[in-house]
Amino acid sequence: MSVFTQLEQQLSEQLSQLQSTQGWIQLTAEVNLSVEESLLLGWLKSQNRHFPHFFFEKRDENQTIATIGAVKTFSSLEEAQVFVQSSSLSLVGGIQFEGICQFVLPRLMLVKNSQNLTAYLTLNLSEQAVDFTEFFTELNSTSPVKNYQISAPQSSCTFEQWKANIEQAIIQIKSGDLSKVVLANAIQLTFENLISAYDLVEQSRAINLGCYHFLWAENAQNAFVGSTPERLYYRKGNQLFTEALAGTVAVSDNPIETEQNAQWLLNDAKNIYENLLVVEDIEEHLNAYVEAFEVHLPEIKRLHNVQHLRRRIEAILKADVLDQDCLRQIH
């Protein structure tokens, strides 16, 4: 019997015994067996009738979250914050660069750690009854994860455009219009076959170790995926954890050369200054909400093809500071 079948049976039994009440209720089922993240991605991939989909694998902790469906949606940080505080239920979602956000209370959330796989089924019993027959029919479905070959990567910016952008940025920095810029270039990938966002995340997981991996799919046609080594925001009580990740050098096939590059990065004035700019920016934006900062010594965050200079940052938050306050400042 698969782990999904076991979870389905537990949730179905609880649903059949549920007394008619009003308000939010969350049913929980647990299997004392861990599963691979690829199985969770395959399960998400097979859920064609329940959206949105959300997948999030933590970087430093053995915990992965996969969700489908939405019982309730929120389009502002304020709304999401109020709901979480009043209900103690977990939301998933994110914030765009422009500040637009979307968070949802998922219909079904699976949480995996090193020992257990736990399912959380959320209902609002004050609303019209929902038929879960179809939902449970797909609960046990999984789709195999495939590998893809890239046929034609194409940069969105030519070398001359790249050079012109840098020169323009320097002019604006000298004039005081900007204090810093982050160099970035978009790459358009063309694949030999039709692709699946879920398979791309699995491929990235295998290559980009030591990263957060995530997926957000509004529907079957559109998905946002990524893998990032950098922590933006983690909170535990009145403690906030973030980090400055800036300054980069290559990782080569030669371990000795890679280590030499790392030592150069730790002592290079330009990269140290670049990293400190990020530290200063974080401190400046959070200063009104923080009682004390602790900036750790620089260290190396090594990935499969590059290594970065990183400073871990811890802060003690003032009383009554909300998540939304911090996120608005550092996002």
Label each residue range with its predicted role.
Residues 1-118:
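A generic N-terminal leader/anchor concept
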Residues 2-36, 59-68, 126, 133-160, ...:
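Contiguous alpha-helical scaffold segments within structured protein domains
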Residues 50-51, 86-89, 115-116, 177-178, ...:
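Short coil/turn connectors at secondary-structure junctions
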Residues 56, 178-185, 214-217:
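ATP-grasp fold ATP-binding core
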Residues 58-61, 65-73, 104, 108, ...:
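An anion-binding catalytic pocket shared by soluble metabolic enzymes
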Residues 75-189, 291:
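Non-catalytic accessory segments adjacent to catalytic cores
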Residues 170-173, 177, 205-208, 286, ...:
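Structural signal for hydrophobic packing residues in well-ordered secondary-structure cores
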Residues 176, 233, 280:
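Residue-level signal for inorganic ion chemistry
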